From Swiss-Prot:
Alphabetical keyword list: Amino-acid biosynthesis, Aminotransferase, Cytoplasm, Pyridoxal phosphate, Pyridoxine biosynthesis, Serine biosynthesis, Transferase
Pfam families: Aminotran_5
Catalytic activity: O-phospho-L-serine + 2-oxoglutarate = 3-phosphooxypyruvate + L-glutamate; 4-(phosphooxy)-L-threonine + 2-oxoglutarate = (R)-3-hydroxy-2-oxo-4-phosphooxybutanoate + L-glutamate
GO cellular component, one term: cytoplasm
Gene expressing this chain: serC
Organism of provenance: Hamiltonella defensa subsp. Acyrthosiphon pisum (strain 5AT)
Keyword Amino-acid biosynthesis: yes
GO molecular function, one term: O-phospho-L-serine:2-oxoglutarate aminotransferase activity
Recorded metabolic or biological pathway in which this protein acts: Amino-acid biosynthesis; L-serine biosynthesis; L-serine from 3-phospho-D-glycerate: step 2/3; Cofactor biosynthesis; pyridoxine 5'-phosphate biosynthesis; pyridoxine 5'-phosphate from D-erythrose 4-phosphate: step 3/5
Binding site for pyridoxal 5'-phosphate: A76, R77, W102, T157, D178, Q201, N243, T244
Cofactor descriptive note: Binds 1 pyridoxal phosphate per subunit.
Protein name, as recorded: Phosphoserine aminotransferase
Superkingdom of the source species: Bacteria
Compartment annotation: Cytoplasm
Keyword Transcription regulation: no
């Protein structure tokens, strides 16, 4: 069976080496009588998996010692609620930067617990007579004086917009970031953040796990009505095992962390990701048949949306069906958008992007 390249925004491809290792270890059930999917999270065997995976993640991101790593459930949407419940404290407001769909979704949830100060950072920027989506410089974000924290999403998966600049503000702010679609794609200066959270299903592992990295001094501030399963202090005190965690997703994520270390770490991964993105964006920009409407300075390295210049529902469906015949799947854009989207996370090999761009050139030649 030929390899299928999955360009879906998530769940995404897993590294082939990780899938093979998991297959081998599951096959050992015949010898051991039990598999990693069946063991207790309290067992010595799984405790070793949990500790190793946490340490490997700390090594990859160079996480300082005054941060806790939590392995949770509920996805990023769960964190949209957990963040204000844990961090607002006695304050009533927090700064929320909007740049796309997911940051707006975080705001909708935050409104249940406080009054978010909404800063619209999106802007349409003219380049050679054409307007492109972009993001205002961080220096122009009008933050409030009394906000408990500032929340933003460095990579918007639907629009394909990224905020590459680090969050440096003129006065101290606890910064909270939704890194769901870009975590582990490049080095992160963790100590610039109070909280980092990410759903696993893009760059970490399979769906079902959520990683939260929280600075120690932000623990113990949760509202009294915060559900225990979302309370950072409770999760930290119980080593992320207040309830039964998604053990198999945690185990597979641990294998991904080891794979990333074996590849040379995040500097090497970032180099590969830039190579893949450059190949895809160049194909789009050099061919009038395709269009990406994000300013080059804010293009995502993970999610590349594009449309056909002569787009019709029939032509779009033809593009998707012919791509699927070539083992290129998951290219349909999000339901809230139109056109196509290629998500090229860490596990997507450069060969997959090469195969996609070759198909795109061929399709444009035939139908352009």
């Amino acid at each position: 069976m030929p390899l299928i390249y999955n360009f879906s925004a998530g769940p995404a491809m897993l590294p082939a080496e990780v899938v093979f290792q998991a297959e081998q270890e599951l096959a050992e059930r015949k010898k051991k009588g039990i598999s990693v999917m069946e063991i207790s999270h309290r067992s010595e065997f799984f405790q070793k998996i949990a500790k190793e995976s946490e340490q490997d993640l700390k090594d990859l991101l160079n996480i300082p010692s005054n941060y806790k790593v939590l392995f949770c459930q509920g996805g990023a949407r769960g964190q949209f609620a957990a963040v204000p419940m844990n961090l607002l404290g006695e304050k009533k407001t927090a700064d929320y930067i909007t740049g796309g769909y997911w940051s707006k979704s975080a705001i909708l949830e935050a409104k249940k617990y406080g009054v978010p100060n909404i800063i619209d950072a999106s802007v349409r920027k003219p380049i050679s007579g054409v307007f492109f989506q972009s993001i205002k410089p961080i220096s122009e974000w009008q933050l409030s004086e009394d906000a408990a924290y500032v929340h933003y999403c460095p990579n918007e998966t639907i629009e394909g917009i990224a905020i590459h600049a680090p969050p440096i503000f003129s006065h101290h702010k606890d910064v909270v970031a939704d890194f769901s679609s870009s975590i582990l794609s490049c080095p992160i200066d963790v100590d610039r953040y109070g909280v980092i959270y990410a759903g696993a299903q893009k760059n970490i592992g399979p769906a079902g796990l959520t990683v939260v990295i929280v600075r120690d001094d932000l623990l113990g501030k949760a509202h009294q009505h915060t559900p225990s399963i979302l309370n950072y202090q409770v999760l930290a005190d119980t080593q992320s095992m207040f309830n039964t965690p998604p053990t198999f997703a945690w185990y597979l994520s641990g294998l991904v962390f080891k794979w990333l270390k074996d590849q040379g770490g995040l500097i090497e991964i970032q180099k590969r990701n830039r190579e893949k993105a450059q190949l895809l964006y160049s194909t789009i920009d050099e061919n009038e048949f395709y269009l990406n409407q994000v300013a080059p300075t804010h293009r995502s390295l993970m999610n590349v949306p594009f449309s056909l210049s002569t787009s019709t529902p029939r032509l779009d469906e033809l593009f998707l069906s012919e791509a699927k015949k070539r083992g290129l799947e998951g290219l349909k854009g999000h339901r809230a958008a139109t056109g196509m989207r290629a998500s090229i996370y860490n596990a997507m090999p450069v060969e997959g992007v090469q195969k996609l761009t070759e198909f795109m050139v061929e399709f444009a030649r035939r139908y352009g």
